[in-house]
Amino acid sequence: MPKRLIVTADDFGLAVPVNEAVELGHLNGILTSASLMVTAPAAADAIERARRLPRLGVGLHMVLVDGQPALPPEQIPDLVAADGRFSRDPFRLGARIFLSSRAQSQAEAEIRAQLTAFRRTRLRLDHVDGHHHFHLHPTVQAILIRLAPEFGIAAIRVPDEPAAVRQHAGASQRMRDWLAAFPLRDRAPAMKRRLARADIRFNDTILGLADSGHIDSARMRALLAALPDGVTELYVHPATRRWGEIDALPDAYRPEAELAALVDPSVRAAVEASGATLTTFQELANPPAVASAESALEESGLSGARS
């Protein structure tokens, strides 16, 4: 089975340093896609940059935890805290959505609003994933599958990082222990079955789960050396510099190092040595020749698909 690699930057739109890193990582490195937070502070800047990058696969980074909703807080009271933002506790919110039909209706309304906001950008929807992987929640999965025909959701990320890959790449024991205790860790196989039945594409494997936020060049090369067959998504959180919100995170969170890894020639060489083809979710449906032709048309201004 051939190896295909999607390299995605999450949190596109969160801040200008993130958006700058997405553009640099795509133009000068191995980054092939980005996941857009449509309600984030720098979303407008991210959208403008994405319009200049026709080969960048842009998906929706659906936010139901730790972020700003698309709907007014009074329309989704079961999902937000007193400040009008989503809760930072995914486990409590997940239980509420699972047990409450009212919360489920509110979650569907909010997801619909975010998909509608993405549609208004006129960017092609490459994929959908979830902030803090909250789309692993079975109710949220069901909502996304139900909305897929209406919004053209053709691919959804499955956060499935095999333990053998983590161990081979040298993930820390602390992170392996944390992932072993992750409440939704066993949802990935069921998620794949549900997506396959709905004819929605997904990655076979994900890389970066155990190393989220601190994948430097050495770690990225180690992950690429362990690249399995099939479709793998490597996700990262790059930025050109730290900013106010991120300063509150531990020093181990190193977005600048992740950008440096994306543009490191030794990392590109590791991709080539792995035998993998860099791609996007969209290209899994469109043959490369077709995708290249479409990109050429967009860059020449002859395609109506470009915003």
What spans do the regions from the language model cover?
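Terminal accessory/targeting
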Residues: 1-6, 16-127, 138-307
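DG-centered beta-turn motif at the end of beta-strands
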Residues: 9-12
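Active-site histidine-anchored catalytic micro-motif
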Residues: 130-132
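Alpha-helical and His/Cys-centered functional microenvironments
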Residues: 135
